[in-house]
A protein has these predicted regions:
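Bacterial N-terminal signal peptides
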Residues: 8-18
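Flexible, solvent-exposed loop/hinge segments and secondary-structure transition points
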Residues: 2, 6-7, 21-130
């Protein structure tokens, strides 16, 4: 009985520790850039019908590019959002990118707002974990 209890407690501790490590895949370093993936970071940030995950690439405290990842948003509208927003933060310092005023895409407001929120999540994460 004591062995089973000890085993269960050990398993619970290991699982708790693993849950704290979940953020390790959020920010990686690639080709001298920090890459922040909002797939798990922004999993609750949804556009019209689905999450809108992104990768934000940062080098020397400056946004290099935004990469739109696969989403279940309506393709017709998500493509419009991607075309309109993909380069809005490029070349800006992280500080300036966080305050950049970006207009939403007409007809794709929810998707646009979700993308903007994911960019802000990525920038905040970068600043607190670099």
């Amino acid at each position: 009985m004591k062995k089973n209890l000890l085993y269960c407690c050990t398993l619970a501790v290991v699982l708790c520790l693993m849950s704290f490590m979940a953020g390790d895949d959020v920010m990686t370093k690639q080709d001298g850039m920090y890459v922040i993936d909002t797939t798990t970071l922004g999993k609750n940030v949804e556009g019209y019908q689905a999450p809108t995950p992104l990768k934000v690439y940062i080098k020397n405290d400056q946004v290099e590019k935004i990469e739109f990842l696969k989403s279940q948003e309506t393709p017709k509208y998500y493509i419009k959002v991607k075309k309109a927003l993909v380069d809005k933060w490029n070349g800006l310092t992280v500080k300036n990118a966080k305050t950049q005023q970006v207009d939403v895409v007409t007809g794709a407001t929810f998707s646009s707002e979700a993308v903007i929120e994911n960019v802000h999540l990525a920038l905040d994460y970068y600043q607190s974990h670099k």
